[in-house]
Amino acid sequence: MNRESFAAGERLVSPAYVRQGCEARRSHEHLIRLLLEKGKCPENGWDESTLELFLHELAIMDSNNFLGNCGVGEREGRVASALVARRHYRFIHGIGRSGDISAVQPKAAGSSLLNKITNSLVLDIIKLAGVHTVANCFVVPMATGMSLTLCFLTLRHKRPKAKYIIWPRIDQKSCFKSMITAGFEPVVIENVLEGDELRTDLKAVEAKVQELGPDCILCIHSTTSCFAPRVPDRLEELAVICANYDIPHIVNNAYGVQSSKCMHLIQQGARVGRIDAFVQSLDKNFMVPVGGAIIAGFNDSFIQEISKMYPGRASASPSLDVLITLLSLGSNGYKKLLKERKEMFSYLSNQIKKLSEAYNERLLHTPHNPISLAMTLKTLDEHRDKAVTQLGSMLFTRQVSGARVVPLGSMQTVSGYTFRGFMSHTNNYPCAYLNAASAIGMKMQDVDLFIKRLDRCLKAVRKERSKESDDNYDKTEDVDIEEMALKLDNVLLDTYQDASS
């Protein structure tokens, strides 16, 4: 309702009441105006009524919601199901145009505005999380792996001779397949063991750059967030190598936005060397459904090139999800979640440490990994290979999700490449182990329930192992008794034969 509508309403209802309602509406509109003017995440989260008003105002700016609209094209925002239309708040046209995912659509001003605001809010949050000098970013409706592929395909046009991507090993399939899908040959750099941690082999990286030649290398593809005992790559040193040899640097920052340490590494890498783009998942960092990522970087023109590489229009669902989430939380709400995650990491670490010691195991010392933890499973692995994988199955059937058990010597072929010791990020890690992570949104009750169920599973596996050991002992003892009886029979037979003769 506008001013004229309220004035007309005063003829039907007491003007004092109408003016009060008008003031209430203005308070909602004031929040919306501040958002459009500043393009930053509000400090305090919005209530649902403000959010729904804002989304409704945007949606009616799209041509499919015009009163009396007549569409005669092949794509006019028609939706057969009213439920589907409501699910998307009647944003049907998606984002971008055929030549650029960030471009404005003439017949979808509301969706275009939604896209611009979302990208602006996400940029603000990335700065808040620790990468203060980021220049540009955009939300893309693909998960991390395909978003990395889009970055590699953009670099292809800038480096036509390149055929290799140097990749410090991380045993995660999608980031590996992102390079294969883009048509490049991954050059796997094995990690080095320093204490319990697996760290970047910088000498091997530089040696491979010199061996292959900088012109033949598309980029170095590094990683921040990862499963312990692997830790984030030495981003500063890798960024310096990239700057010295004029090689692009793409960072897989999948769930690193929630970690101040990961974001600091990216900021420092860009300060001392070269980082062209870093990619992060929406669902892992902002607690929204799977299917979106953020591509960000320090060179505005390069990020625009990546957005123009995306073919066709794109789904607005990931952008809408993260926009609603950030406006609901506000920057203070998101900062609170980051703080709670750090606290849960310390709590989870302490609880796993106590439990591991009770079973003669230990928490691996991985101080450079700010999200993931690992506990040894030596006592299980020494006795029976299947005991380690059995523990993982038991946890899963007891509704513990996210925990990973990593046995020794696992082999895995991914896109024609065979990895020894797959899941452990190295060919021969010294022991089997169990992973758990403290990610954004974790609560204390999650940790307590996990520790309780892990304790029960470890007891059950040990009890079964002990029973098998007893059974094996009994079988061995029976065989020994039979052999002794047979020998005694032979002695008695010989004695009888001697007496007879």
Swiss-Prot record:
TRNA binds at residues 271, 398, 463. One of its GO terms (cellular component) is cytoplasm. The keyword Nuclease does not apply. The modification Phosphoserine is found at residue 14. Residues 1-44 are annotated as: Tetramerization. The modification N6-(pyridoxal phosphate)lysine is found at residue 284. The record marks 74 as: May act as a substrate filter by repelling compounds with a negatively charged alpha-carboxylate. Its main location: cytoplasm. Residues 96-106 are annotated as: Phosphate loop (P-loop). Pathway: Aminoacyl-tRNA biosynthesis; selenocysteinyl-tRNA(Sec) biosynthesis; selenocysteinyl-tRNA(Sec) from L-seryl-tRNA(Sec) (archaeal/eukaryal route): step 2/2. Its cofactor is pyridoxal 5'-phosphate. It is found in: Cytoplasm. InterPro entries: Peroxidases_heam-ligand_BS (IPR019793), PyrdxlP-dep_Trfase (IPR015424), PyrdxlP-dep_Trfase_major (IPR015421), Sec-tRNA_Se_transferase (IPR019872), SepSecS/SepCysS (IPR008829). Keywords: Cytoplasm, Disease variant, Epilepsy, Intellectual disability, Neurodegeneration, Phosphoprotein, Protein biosynthesis, Pyridoxal phosphate, RNA-binding, Selenium, Transferase, tRNA-binding. Possible diagnostic marker for autoimmune hepatitis (AIH). Homotetramer formed by a catalytic dimer and a non-catalytic dimer serving as a binding platform that orients tRNASec for catalysis. Each tetramer binds the CCA ends of two tRNAs which point to the active sites of the catalytic dimer. Converts O-phosphoseryl-tRNA(Sec) to selenocysteinyl-tRNA(Sec) required for selenoprotein biosynthesis. Belongs to the SepSecS family. It is linked to Pontocerebellar hypoplasia 2D: A disorder characterized by postnatal onset of progressive atrophy of the cerebrum and cerebellum, microcephaly, profound intellectual disability, spasticity, and variable seizures. This is O-phosphoseryl-tRNA(Sec) selenium transferase. It comes from Homo sapiens (Human).
